[in-house]
Amino acid sequence: MLLQIDRVLTTEELNQLNTLLQAGVFEDGKWTAGIYAKTVKDNQQLVQEGEEYRVASEIVLSALSRNQLFQAYVQPKIIGPLLFSRYEVGMAYGTHTDNALMGSGDQLRRSDVSLTIFLNDPFAYEGGALVLDTSLGEQYFKLPAGSMIVYPSIFLHRVETVSKGVRLVAVAWVQSLIRDPLERELLFELDTVRRSLFEKQGKTVDFDLLCKVYSNLLRKWAEI
């Protein structure tokens, strides 16, 4: 299941992020790619040692933590690493799959869910669409600034060549409490139904039963 979430970042946060990215130092993005993906990766990334990266990461992580739709859909256990990517004219990221495991040692984590937050509007650049190769065919995403696309990390995907302007995005990977994407989707749909039922009817017997089913499935599937 793919999920588009609009207005994840406020206008003030977007302005802060763009100021930080303008002041920050960027480096070749290949160093964060896997051994095969780096052969098709051509972009720049904000260096992670700088103050700009620290502050920008805090802004994005705060936005994700307060977004109820993201929390309900993803069931995040670990979010990271965060990357702030810049694509200038001629840059692209060819077809690839995300590494199943990221980090090392105590920081080793599984990539269950991928996300891209768009930091500038589509009219600021030409090309640069995120393309996911799904069972329904290729799906193209080029969203307004502050909007986000969230998807299971199982898909082949690419970023089309930027032909004009500059594309700015934040990307991250999440280890979910729920490893299986189908189980994660079922829990999300159950949660959506119970919230809707509560808003319409309040705390009824049916609502309590849904809560019981949701809680027991979460207990069965969650990996702590």
From Swiss-Prot:
Pfam family, one: 2OG-FeII_Oxy_3
EC number per UniProt: 1.14.11.-
Residues that, per the record, bind 2-oxoglutarate: 167
Necessary cofactors: Fe(2+); L-ascorbate
Cofactor binding note: Binds 1 Fe(2+) ion per subunit.
Residues annotated as binding Fe cation: 96, 98, 157
Record bears the keyword Oxidoreductase: yes
Recorded superkingdom: Bacteria
InterPro entries: Oxoglu/Fe-dep_dioxygenase_dom (IPR005123), PKHD_C (IPR041097), PKHD_hydroxylase (IPR023550), Pro_4_hyd_alph (IPR006620), Pro_4_hyd_alph_FE2OG_OXY (IPR044862)
Keywords noted in UniProt: Dioxygenase, Iron, Metal-binding, Oxidoreductase, Vitamin C
GO molecular function, one term: L-ascorbic acid binding
EC class: oxidoreductase
Domain Fe2OG dioxygenase stretches: 77-176
Single biological process term from Gene Ontology: DNA damage response
HAMAP family noted in UniProt: Hydroxyl_YbiX
Protein name as catalogued: PKHD-type hydroxylase tll1907
